[in-house]
Design a protein with these regions (language model features):
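Beta-sandwich/jelly-roll carbohydrate-recognition scaffolds of carbohydrate-active enzymes
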Residues: 1-162
Length: 162
């Protein structure tokens, strides 16, 4: 793992077989919930996550915008979203009642309190995958500009050496 002022890059080494990369927007270091995800391409996602309620200040809430890229196309990908608990007739027919629902064929935007994206890979022994993340407190476009400006044309090792 390495970073620049407004970006991060992680390198993961996997065994042979099925491997996965997850971006969990339902968990965080603060108590605030709410996120939005959009699949831009097979290897790029963008969105926003609300952060806040930090240091006992419930009004200190702010968005963090991001662009995430992976360096290899996954064999499959999708979203997950925690479903609200239901009662009565609704609960009887919904197998995902109060649980996490996987969206394996849905490729449009998704929003919610407990969402994420998964990418599945068939990897070889010691295969390395890299994940780049640009962030901004201003906009998704600024997050993309930060990623392009601080990592474009650089390898993981070059960023790590800086």
């Amino acid at each position: 793992m390495s970073a620049t002022p407004r970006t991060g890059v992680s390198r993961f080494t996997f065994p042979a077989g099925q491997s996965h990369i997850l971006l969990n927007l339902g968990e965080g270091l603060t108590n605030e919930t709410g996120a939005f995800l959009k699949q831009v391409s097979d290897t790029e996602f963008e969105g926003v996550k609300l952060l806040g309620t930090f240091c006992y200040n419930p009004q200190a809430v702010f968005p963090i915008y991001f662009v995430m890229r992976v360096n290899k196309q996954p064999t499959s990908s999708g979203y997950w979203k925690k479903q609200r608990p239901m009662t009565g007739v609704e609960a009887e027919w919904d197998k995902d009642n109060g649980k996490f629902k996987l969206y394996t064929n849905y490729k449009k935007d998704i929003a919610g309190d407990d969402i994420g994206v998964f990418m599945n890979y068939d990897t070889k022994t010691n295969e390395q995958l890299e994940v780049q993340m640009g962030v901004s407190f201003v906009s998704i476009e600024n997050a993309r500009q930060n990623l392009e400006g601080e990592q474009k044309g650089k390898t993981f090792d070059q960023i790590h050496a800086e």
